[in-house]
Protein backbone atom coordinates (compact mmCIF):
# COMPACT_ATOMS: atom_id res chain seq x y z
CA UNK A 1 0.00 0.00 0.00
CA UNK A 2 1.01 3.59 -0.49
CA UNK A 3 1.48 5.49 2.75
CA UNK A 4 2.91 8.77 1.64
CA UNK A 5 2.10 11.73 3.89
CA UNK A 6 0.18 14.49 2.15
CA UNK A 7 2.05 17.79 2.33
CA UNK A 8 0.20 21.07 2.09
CA UNK A 9 2.03 24.14 0.92
CA UNK A 10 0.76 27.50 2.15
CA UNK A 11 2.34 30.57 0.61
CA UNK A 12 2.38 33.69 2.79
CA UNK A 13 3.00 36.97 1.02
CA UNK A 14 4.59 39.68 3.13
CA UNK A 15 3.52 43.16 2.18
CA UNK A 16 5.71 45.04 4.64
CA UNK A 17 8.01 46.73 2.13
CA UNK A 18 7.23 50.42 2.01
CA UNK A 19 8.69 52.38 -0.86
CA UNK A 20 9.21 56.12 -0.70
CA UNK A 21 6.52 57.97 -2.57
CA UNK A 22 4.04 55.01 -2.57
CA UNK A 23 0.51 55.98 -1.71
CA UNK A 24 -1.64 54.24 0.92
CA UNK A 25 -3.76 52.91 -1.95
CA UNK A 26 -0.68 51.11 -3.29
CA UNK A 27 -0.09 49.61 0.15
CA UNK A 28 -3.70 48.41 0.32
CA UNK A 29 -3.42 46.87 -3.14
CA UNK A 30 -0.31 44.99 -2.08
CA UNK A 31 -2.03 43.71 1.05
CA UNK A 32 -5.08 42.64 -0.96
CA UNK A 33 -2.85 40.72 -3.38
CA UNK A 34 -1.14 39.02 -0.46
CA UNK A 35 -4.50 38.05 1.03
CA UNK A 36 -5.66 36.65 -2.32
CA UNK A 37 -2.47 34.62 -2.72
CA UNK A 38 -2.79 33.20 0.79
CA UNK A 39 -6.46 32.31 0.25
CA UNK A 40 -5.75 30.59 -3.09
CA UNK A 41 -2.88 28.63 -1.58
CA UNK A 42 -5.05 27.54 1.34
CA UNK A 43 -7.73 26.34 -1.09
CA UNK A 44 -5.11 24.32 -2.98
CA UNK A 45 -3.88 22.77 0.26
CA UNK A 46 -7.42 21.71 1.14
CA UNK A 47 -7.76 19.65 -2.06
CA UNK A 48 -6.15 16.65 -0.32
CA UNK A 49 -7.47 14.68 2.62
CA UNK A 50 -7.92 11.16 3.93
CA UNK A 51 -9.71 8.69 1.65
CA UNK A 52 -10.63 5.03 2.01
CA UNK A 53 -11.07 2.95 -1.14
CA UNK A 54 -13.00 -0.32 -0.78
CA UNK A 55 -11.73 -3.37 -2.68
CA UNK A 56 -13.84 -6.46 -3.38
CA UNK A 57 -12.10 -9.60 -2.14
CA UNK A 58 -10.94 -11.68 -5.10
CA UNK A 59 -12.00 -9.22 -7.82
CA UNK A 60 -8.86 -8.48 -9.81
CA UNK A 61 -10.13 -5.38 -11.59
CA UNK A 62 -11.22 -4.01 -8.21
CA UNK A 63 -7.71 -4.49 -6.84
CA UNK A 64 -5.96 -3.15 -9.94
CA UNK A 65 -8.04 0.02 -10.28
CA UNK A 66 -7.96 0.71 -6.54
CA UNK A 67 -4.17 0.39 -6.42
CA UNK A 68 -3.90 2.63 -9.48
CA UNK A 69 -6.08 5.33 -7.94
CA UNK A 70 -4.34 5.00 -4.60
CA UNK A 71 -1.09 5.92 -6.33
CA UNK A 72 -2.63 8.74 -8.38
CA UNK A 73 -4.47 10.31 -5.45
CA UNK A 74 -1.47 10.11 -3.13
CA UNK A 75 0.68 11.75 -5.79
CA UNK A 76 -1.87 14.57 -5.71
CA UNK A 77 -1.84 15.19 -1.97
CA UNK A 78 -4.30 12.66 -0.57
CA UNK A 79 -3.66 10.03 2.07
CA UNK A 80 -5.29 6.79 0.94
CA UNK A 81 -6.14 3.53 2.68
CA UNK A 82 -7.41 0.37 0.98
CA UNK A 83 -9.94 -1.81 2.81
CA UNK A 84 -10.75 -5.33 1.56
CA UNK A 85 -14.18 -6.93 2.00
CA UNK A 86 -16.91 -8.89 0.24
CA UNK A 87 -19.46 -6.91 -1.80
CA UNK A 88 -22.22 -6.94 0.84
CA UNK A 89 -19.86 -5.44 3.42
CA UNK A 90 -18.52 -2.89 0.93
CA UNK A 91 -21.93 -1.57 -0.11
CA UNK A 92 -23.03 -1.30 3.51
CA UNK A 93 -19.77 0.47 4.35
CA UNK A 94 -20.11 2.99 1.52
CA UNK A 95 -23.72 3.67 2.51
CA UNK A 96 -22.63 4.20 6.13
CA UNK A 97 -19.77 6.48 5.11
CA UNK A 98 -17.07 4.10 6.38
CA UNK A 99 -15.64 3.78 2.85
CA UNK A 100 -15.33 6.68 0.44
CA UNK A 101 -15.13 4.99 -2.96
CA UNK A 102 -15.60 1.61 -4.65
CA UNK A 103 -14.53 1.27 -8.29
CA UNK A 104 -16.05 -2.10 -9.22
CA UNK A 105 -19.84 -1.92 -9.29
CA UNK A 106 -21.26 -4.04 -12.14
CA UNK A 107 -24.56 -2.89 -13.62
CA UNK A 108 -27.29 -3.48 -14.60
CA UNK A 109 -27.21 -7.12 -13.43
CA UNK A 110 -24.47 -8.30 -11.09
CA UNK A 111 -24.80 -5.75 -8.30
CA UNK A 112 -28.38 -4.66 -9.01
CA UNK A 113 -29.69 -5.93 -5.68
CA UNK A 114 -27.17 -3.80 -3.78
CA UNK A 115 -28.08 -0.69 -5.76
CA UNK A 116 -31.76 -1.40 -5.09
CA UNK A 117 -30.95 -1.51 -1.37
CA UNK A 118 -28.35 1.25 -1.05
CA UNK A 119 -28.66 3.35 -4.21
CA UNK A 120 -30.31 6.31 -2.50
CA UNK A 121 -27.53 6.41 0.13
CA UNK A 122 -24.54 6.50 -2.24
CA UNK A 123 -23.33 8.56 -5.22
CA UNK A 124 -22.74 7.28 -8.74
CA UNK A 125 -19.57 8.81 -10.19
CA UNK A 126 -19.60 7.13 -13.59
CA UNK A 127 -18.76 4.05 -15.66
CA UNK A 128 -15.12 3.41 -16.59
CA UNK A 129 -15.65 0.19 -18.60
CA UNK A 130 -18.71 -0.61 -20.72
CA UNK A 131 -18.25 -4.14 -22.06
CA UNK A 132 -17.99 -6.31 -18.95
CA UNK A 133 -19.58 -9.76 -19.05
CA UNK A 134 -20.25 -12.71 -16.78
CA UNK A 135 -19.01 -15.94 -18.35
CA UNK A 136 -18.76 -19.69 -17.98
CA UNK A 137 -15.38 -20.73 -19.37
CA UNK A 138 -13.70 -24.02 -20.24
CA UNK A 139 -10.33 -25.11 -21.57
CA UNK A 140 -10.01 -24.17 -25.24
CA UNK A 141 -9.90 -27.80 -26.41
CA UNK A 142 -12.94 -28.87 -24.38
CA UNK A 143 -15.48 -31.05 -26.25
CA UNK A 144 -18.33 -28.52 -25.88
CA UNK A 145 -18.88 -24.97 -27.11
CA UNK A 146 -22.23 -24.16 -25.54
CA UNK A 147 -23.86 -24.34 -22.14
CA UNK A 148 -26.68 -26.19 -23.89
CA UNK A 149 -24.31 -29.13 -24.49
CA UNK A 150 -22.81 -29.23 -21.01
CA UNK A 151 -25.33 -31.49 -19.26
CA UNK A 152 -24.63 -34.32 -21.68
CA UNK A 153 -20.87 -34.00 -21.13
CA UNK A 154 -20.83 -34.53 -17.38
CA UNK A 155 -18.33 -37.38 -17.54
CA UNK A 156 -15.88 -35.21 -19.49
CA UNK A 157 -15.82 -32.62 -16.71
CA UNK A 158 -16.34 -34.78 -13.65
CA UNK A 159 -19.75 -33.18 -13.19
CA UNK A 160 -18.14 -30.13 -11.54
CA UNK A 161 -18.39 -26.38 -12.00
CA UNK A 162 -15.72 -24.46 -10.12
CA UNK A 163 -17.00 -21.11 -8.88
CA UNK A 164 -15.76 -18.14 -6.87
CA UNK A 165 -16.95 -16.48 -3.64
CA UNK A 166 -20.37 -17.63 -2.33
CA UNK A 167 -21.62 -14.04 -2.00
CA UNK A 168 -20.68 -12.94 -5.52
CA UNK A 169 -23.36 -11.90 -8.00
CA UNK A 170 -21.83 -14.31 -10.52
CA UNK A 171 -22.33 -17.15 -8.05
CA UNK A 172 -26.00 -16.27 -7.57
CA UNK A 173 -26.54 -16.01 -11.32
CA UNK A 174 -24.90 -19.38 -11.89
CA UNK A 175 -26.92 -21.03 -9.12
CA UNK A 176 -30.27 -19.41 -9.87
CA UNK A 177 -30.22 -19.08 -13.67
CA UNK A 178 -27.48 -21.05 -15.43
CA UNK A 179 -27.79 -24.36 -13.57
CA UNK A 180 -31.61 -24.78 -13.72
CA UNK A 181 -31.89 -23.45 -17.28
CA UNK A 182 -29.35 -25.89 -18.70
CA UNK A 183 -30.28 -28.93 -16.60
CA UNK A 184 -27.15 -28.96 -14.46
CA UNK A 185 -28.84 -29.63 -11.12
CA UNK A 186 -26.95 -32.90 -10.71
CA UNK A 187 -23.58 -31.20 -11.13
CA UNK A 188 -21.49 -30.17 -8.14
CA UNK A 189 -21.18 -26.38 -7.96
CA UNK A 190 -18.09 -25.59 -5.90
CA UNK A 191 -17.70 -22.13 -4.35
CA UNK A 192 -14.77 -20.87 -2.30
CA UNK A 193 -12.75 -17.97 -3.69
CA UNK A 194 -11.48 -16.52 -6.95
CA UNK A 195 -7.84 -17.44 -6.19
CA UNK A 196 -8.92 -21.03 -5.47
CA UNK A 197 -10.82 -21.19 -8.76
CA UNK A 198 -7.83 -19.85 -10.69
CA UNK A 199 -5.55 -22.35 -8.99
CA UNK A 200 -7.83 -25.22 -10.05
CA UNK A 201 -7.95 -23.81 -13.58
CA UNK A 202 -4.16 -23.60 -13.74
CA UNK A 203 -3.75 -27.16 -12.44
CA UNK A 204 -6.34 -28.64 -14.82
CA UNK A 205 -4.79 -26.98 -17.86
CA UNK A 206 -1.30 -28.08 -16.82
CA UNK A 207 -2.57 -31.66 -16.55
CA UNK A 208 -4.52 -31.56 -19.81
CA UNK A 209 -7.84 -31.98 -18.03
CA UNK A 210 -11.23 -30.50 -18.85
CA UNK A 211 -12.62 -27.93 -16.44
CA UNK A 212 -15.62 -25.59 -16.17
CA UNK A 213 -15.21 -22.33 -14.23
CA UNK A 214 -17.28 -19.24 -13.57
CA UNK A 215 -15.40 -16.19 -14.80
CA UNK A 216 -15.92 -12.70 -16.12
CA UNK A 217 -14.49 -10.22 -18.58
CA UNK A 218 -12.38 -8.18 -18.18
CA UNK A 219 -10.03 -10.62 -16.42
CA UNK A 220 -6.32 -11.28 -16.84
CA UNK A 221 -7.00 -15.05 -17.08
CA UNK A 222 -8.05 -14.60 -20.71
CA UNK A 223 -4.54 -13.48 -21.54
CA UNK A 224 -2.80 -16.01 -19.32
CA UNK A 225 -4.72 -19.24 -20.05
CA UNK A 226 -5.89 -21.05 -23.19
CA UNK A 227 -9.61 -20.93 -22.44
CA UNK A 228 -12.88 -20.15 -24.21
CA UNK A 229 -16.32 -18.97 -23.14
CA UNK A 230 -19.29 -21.27 -23.56
CA UNK A 231 -22.13 -19.85 -25.60
CA UNK A 232 -25.20 -18.91 -23.59
CA UNK A 233 -28.12 -19.28 -26.03
CA UNK A 234 -30.74 -18.67 -23.32
CA UNK A 235 -29.06 -15.46 -22.11
CA UNK A 236 -28.85 -16.61 -18.50
CA UNK A 237 -25.67 -14.62 -17.83
CA UNK A 238 -27.21 -11.37 -19.04
CA UNK A 239 -26.01 -8.79 -21.52
CA UNK A 240 -22.78 -6.83 -21.42
CA UNK A 241 -22.48 -4.73 -18.28
CA UNK A 242 -20.76 -1.51 -17.28
CA UNK A 243 -18.30 -1.23 -14.40
CA UNK A 244 -19.19 1.85 -12.40
CA UNK A 245 -17.51 3.83 -9.63
CA UNK A 246 -19.65 4.75 -6.62
CA UNK A 247 -18.90 6.92 -3.60
CA UNK A 248 -20.41 7.69 -0.24
CA UNK A 249 -23.06 10.36 -0.02
CA UNK A 250 -21.48 13.81 0.03
CA UNK A 251 -18.18 12.70 -1.51
CA UNK A 252 -18.45 14.99 -4.54
CA UNK A 253 -19.03 17.97 -2.28
CA UNK A 254 -16.23 17.08 0.13
CA UNK A 255 -13.68 16.10 -2.52
CA UNK A 256 -14.74 17.84 -5.72
CA UNK A 257 -11.42 17.41 -7.52
CA UNK A 258 -11.09 13.69 -6.79
CA UNK A 259 -14.74 13.16 -7.71
CA UNK A 260 -14.19 14.87 -11.06
CA UNK A 261 -11.15 12.72 -11.84
CA UNK A 262 -12.96 9.50 -10.92
CA UNK A 263 -16.05 10.55 -12.88
CA UNK A 264 -13.98 11.07 -16.04
CA UNK A 265 -11.96 7.86 -15.62
CA UNK A 266 -12.05 5.24 -18.39
CA UNK A 267 -9.72 2.28 -18.99
CA UNK A 268 -9.64 -0.17 -21.89
CA UNK A 269 -9.24 -3.93 -21.56
CA UNK A 270 -5.66 -3.98 -22.87
CA UNK A 271 -4.41 -1.57 -20.22
CA UNK A 272 -6.38 -3.31 -17.48
CA UNK A 273 -5.12 -6.79 -18.42
CA UNK A 274 -1.56 -5.49 -18.49
CA UNK A 275 -1.81 -3.99 -15.00
CA UNK A 276 -3.54 -7.09 -13.63
CA UNK A 277 -0.87 -9.34 -15.12
CA UNK A 278 1.88 -7.25 -13.51
CA UNK A 279 0.18 -7.68 -10.13
CA UNK A 280 -0.29 -11.44 -10.45
CA UNK A 281 2.14 -13.36 -8.30
CA UNK A 282 3.38 -10.23 -6.55
CA UNK A 283 3.28 -10.09 -2.77
CA UNK A 284 1.00 -7.40 -1.38
CA UNK A 285 4.08 -5.71 0.05
CA UNK A 286 5.39 -5.28 -3.49
CA UNK A 287 2.22 -3.72 -4.93
CA UNK A 288 3.57 -0.19 -4.52
CA UNK A 289 6.66 -0.82 -6.64
CA UNK A 290 4.74 -2.88 -9.21
CA UNK A 291 2.16 -0.13 -9.71
CA UNK A 292 4.86 2.56 -9.75
CA UNK A 293 6.70 0.71 -12.53
CA UNK A 294 3.49 0.24 -14.48
CA UNK A 295 2.63 3.93 -14.14
CA UNK A 296 6.11 4.89 -15.35
CA UNK A 297 5.60 2.73 -18.43
CA UNK A 298 2.20 4.33 -19.08
CA UNK A 299 2.93 7.82 -17.77
CA UNK A 300 1.24 9.80 -20.53
CA UNK A 301 -2.04 7.93 -20.10
CA UNK A 302 -1.90 8.15 -16.29
CA UNK A 303 -1.22 11.89 -16.46
CA UNK A 304 -4.30 12.31 -18.66
CA UNK A 305 -6.50 11.03 -15.83
CA UNK A 306 -5.89 14.18 -13.80
CA UNK A 307 -5.37 16.66 -16.64
Regions found by a protein language model. Name each.
Residues 1-9:
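Bacterial N-terminal signal peptides that target proteins for export
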Residues 6-7, 19-42:
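Bacterial lipoprotein signal-peptidase II cleavage site
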Residues 46-61, 78-83, 158-162, 262:
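Short, well-ordered beta-strand elements
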Residues 57-60, 82-93, 188-200:
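Short helix-initiation/N-cap motifs at beta->coil->alpha
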Residues 60-79, 179:
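Short, polar/charged alpha-helical segment
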Residues 99-103, 166-169, 173-235:
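Ligand-binding pocket segment of bilobal, Venus flytrap-like solute-binding proteins
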Residues 119-167:
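A conserved helix-loop-strand patch within extracytoplasmic ligand-binding domains
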Residues 133-143, 241-256:
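A bilobed periplasmic-binding-protein/Venus flytrap-type ligand-binding module shared by bacterial periplasmic
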Amino acid sequence: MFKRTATAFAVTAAAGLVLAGCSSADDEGTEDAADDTTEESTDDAMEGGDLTLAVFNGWDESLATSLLWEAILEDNGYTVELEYADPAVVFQGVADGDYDVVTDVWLPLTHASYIDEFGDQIEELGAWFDSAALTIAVNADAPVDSLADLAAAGDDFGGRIVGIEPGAGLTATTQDAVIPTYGLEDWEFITSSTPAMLSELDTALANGENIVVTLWEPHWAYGAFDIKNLEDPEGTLGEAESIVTYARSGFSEDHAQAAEWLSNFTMDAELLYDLENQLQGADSGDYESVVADWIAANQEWVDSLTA
